[in-house]
Regions:
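C-terminal binding/interaction regions
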Residues: 1-54, 59-167
Length: 167
């Protein structure tokens, strides 16, 4: 169906959603940060020098989702009605996974808000732990699921099942 953010002359535009119906829309994005053993332990035990890493990262992820339209030029400003940021720690991978779920009743979806929320949360983990690990890697950020609107349900699922009980 082509790119929607360009006019017939190739100039960037914000898509006109005026005539679209308000519907409940929800999106979940995920990503992960891999860390060394020292960081993993400090985050899990709450002993990182800068404080409660996952608590601060949760707040940052919510703030990131709310500020998406300030960061992504063609994103509409949306009245988000729900934003939930959750972490899962998988010791066998020395990885901290982040899920961000965003909901809105509106004319356009919240995929970018969910992706931004997960990204900002993981960047915050990086920022708070960079003194302990110079080789952390953020990756595998993608849309897991979205619902509502013209596209209906899109379920990409998780790329890899995480081991049960490792949270």
């Amino acid at each position: 169906s082509g790119f929607t953010h360009f006019d017939e002359k190739g100039k960037a535009i914000m898509v006109d959603v005026t005539e679209k119906q308000d519907t409940v829309r929800e999106a979940t994005a995920t990503g992960k940060i891999t860390v060394n053993e020292e960081v993993f332990r400090a985050v899990k035990e709450g002993t990182a020098g800068k404080g409660d890493v996952l608590g601060v990262a949760t707040t940052a992820g919510i703030m990131g989702a709310k500020r998406t339209s300030d960061l992504i030029p063609m994103c509409h400003i949306l009245p988000i009605t729900k934003c939930k940021v959750e972490f899962e720690m998988v010791e066998s991978e020395l990885a901290i996974y982040c899920n961000c779920t965003v909901r809105v009743t509106g004319k356009t979806g919240v995929e970018m808000e969910a992706l931004t929320g997960a990204s900002v949360a993981l960047l915050t983990v990086y920022d708070m732990c960079k003194a302990m690990d110079k080789k952390m890697e953020i990756g595998e950020i993608y849309l897991v699921r979205k619902s509502g609107g013209k596209s209906g349900l899109i379920n990409n699922g998780y790329k890899k099942e995480r081991k049960e009980g490792e949270k």
